[in-house]
């Protein structure tokens, strides 16, 4: 049973005419809709059972790289949606073959890195951001950044960030990543610093050598400012 806007929907199997007669008599109303289950149509009970099995499969799986590609999953009206960092046919096949397969699965996520040519500032009014090292290995799981505050006042920031990379054609694109962040506010006092780490997910999508940009928003005098720090990845580090 579920609501489609204001309409009550009963999911049934078998004879819908008989089911409607029984439900109309029991409820004293005709203001509902029947949805025939069977074949590729799953009831909520069936979907919940499949999700329970999926929970177990994911917990027991040793394929950490495949699990890291999953940002979440849940029961919808007719499918179980599985959200992936990289949602290519190859990644879907990998999940179905090594974690679990079901016709009820529906995948969502980025199929190709999104173009993002945005730029930010790396210093403003005594506030500046820099990578701990200018160059990291393409195999690096994380990159560390330092945000320094010498503005004479306090600044605010959070956990959210994103990373872009320059592709072989010189176009800047967003690095696929888990975009779910805990909502926390930090206050950085004058002459203090904050250390941040950005995950690069090399086990989900092998990163190429080249230029990368880290973006991080801070609030200065109640105004948001997009900070940016550039770094490189190298095969030789």
Predicted regions and their residues:
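Short glycine/threonine-rich beta-strand-turn micro-motifs
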Residues: 1-47, 63-98, 143
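Short proline/glycine- and acidic-rich turn/helix-capping motifs at secondary-structure junctions
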Residues: 34-52, 107-119
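A charged, solvent-exposed segment within the mature domains of Sec-exported extracytoplasmic proteins
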Residues: 56-117, 222-236
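Short beta-strand segments enriched in hydrophobic/aromatic residues
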Residues: 86, 200, 218-220
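Primarily secretory-pathway and cell-envelope proteins
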Residues: 113-182, 187-188, 217-237
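Intrinsically disordered, low-complexity Pro/Gly/Ser/Thr-rich segments with frequent PxxP/GP/PP motifs
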Residues: 178-205
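A short tyrosine-centered beta-strand micro-motif
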Residues: 207-218
């Amino acid at each position: 049973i579920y609501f489609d806007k204001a309409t009550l929907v009963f999911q049934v199997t078998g004879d819908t005419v008989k089911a409607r007669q029984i439900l109309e008599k029991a409820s004293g109303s005709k203001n509902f809709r029947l949805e025939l289950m069977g074949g590729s149509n799953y009831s909520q009970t069936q979907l919940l059972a499949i999700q329970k099995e999926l929970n177990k499969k994911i917990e027991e799986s040793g394929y950490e790289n495949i699990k890291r590609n999953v940002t979440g999953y849940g029961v919808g009206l007719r499918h179980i949606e599985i959200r992936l960092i990289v949602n290519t046919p190859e990644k879907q096949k990998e999940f179905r073959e090594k974690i679990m397969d079901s016709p009820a699965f529906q995948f969502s996520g980025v199929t190709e890195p999104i173009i993002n040519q945005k730029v930010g500032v790396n210093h403003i009014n005594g506030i500046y951001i820099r990578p701990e090292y200018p160059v990291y290995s393409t195999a690096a799981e994380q990159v560390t950044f330092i945000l320094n505050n010498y503005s004479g006042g306090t600044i605010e920031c959070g956990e959210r960030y994103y990373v872009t990379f320059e592709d072989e054609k010189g176009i800047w694109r967003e690095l696929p990543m888990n975009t779910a962040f805990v909502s926390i506010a930090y206050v950085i006092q004058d002459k203090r610093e904050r250390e941040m780490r950005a995950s690069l997910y090399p086990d989900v999508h092998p990163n190429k050598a080249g230029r990368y940009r880290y973006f991080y928003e801070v609030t200065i005098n109640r105004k948001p400012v997009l900070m940016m720090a550039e770094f490189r990845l190298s095969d030789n580090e």
